[in-house]
């Protein structure tokens, strides 16, 4: 029988990226945090679902905080120090995610809300009757 092939770990090089952009997409069901460099290449990302939350717990502020901490930790390992934050969506995890990034040690230089607003575009879904 042939000798087992040794698998080597990931060959991702550690980049030194001092500043970048954090995109926080916060919906009612989940929060996704993506950290990229200034040219748009994603350095790290995390979400409430990837942090181990399932179902309705993904939409909570605590889940957003956990996701932001995980993404920030990986960005700090790449040498990131200053960030601009772009927030999108109406979810409950917006503020907690920003606060978690600040506590993790990233210096926030700008916070911008980029939630898309329709100029009376598509018809909205019908109202829920519970």
Swiss-Prot record:
Cross-referenced Pfam families: Ribosomal_S11 (PF00411)
Record GO biological process: translation
Molecular function GO terms recorded: rRNA binding; structural constituent of ribosome
InterPro entries, per the entry: Ribosomal_uS11, Ribosomal_uS11_bac-type, Ribosomal_uS11_CS, Ribosomal_uS11_sf
Keyword Lyase set for record: no
Any one Gene Ontology cellular component term annotated for this protein: ribosome
Keywords (A to Z) from UniProt: Ribonucleoprotein, Ribosomal protein, RNA-binding, rRNA-binding
General function of this protein: Located on the platform of the 30S subunit, it bridges several disparate RNA helices of the 16S rRNA. Forms part of the Shine-Dalgarno cleft in the 70S ribosome.
Homology family: Belongs to the universal ribosomal protein uS11 family.
Subunit field text: Part of the 30S ribosomal subunit. Interacts with proteins S7 and S18. Binds to IF-3.
Name listed for the protein in its UniProt record: Small ribosomal subunit protein uS11
GN (gene name): rpsK
């Amino acid at each position: 029988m042939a000798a087992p092939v040794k698998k080597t770990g990931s060959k991702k090089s550690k980049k030194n990226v001092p500043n970048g952009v954090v995109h926080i997409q916060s919906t009612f069901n989940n929060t996704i945090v993506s950290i990229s460099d200034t040219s748009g290449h994603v350095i790290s990302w995390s979400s409430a679902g990837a942090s181990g939350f399932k179902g309705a717990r993904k939409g909570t502020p605590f889940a957003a905080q956990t996701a932001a901490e995980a993404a920030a930790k990986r960005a700090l390992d790449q040498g990131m120090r200053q960030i601009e934050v772009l927030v999108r969506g109406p979810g409950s995890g917006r503020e907690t995610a920003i606060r978690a990034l600040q506590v993790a040690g990233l210096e926030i230089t700008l916070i911008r809300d980029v939630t898309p607003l329709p100029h009376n575009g598509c018809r909205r879904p019908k109202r829920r009757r519970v």
